[in-house]
């Protein structure tokens, strides 16, 4: 096989792989994280909705989900010495309980019946790493 043909095939293969990684082009903003990942996977599955809030975790609305996960109302600045939320430590996905739950590390994986794809977990992780902003 001529060298130029091999080079073209290799470039085509690499381009195809790059196109398959749709995670990088999906936003890591709170609106997307809640509406596209948490709400359909956690709240509408009747586990963490307003009517069936397991462990007092209501993820059904953007406001309630943010308050539960981060520990403050969206838009309110953190107060000095304020404890962080039960699930998210902004800027620190490696020590955020939400990441342990989504990956099933040291605990039962969430959601238990249909774990999130790695790409969606990566988006949540990126959101936390970026400081878990709500806007």
Task: List each language-model region with its residue ranges.
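Solvent-exposed helix-loop boundary motif
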Residues: 21-118, 122
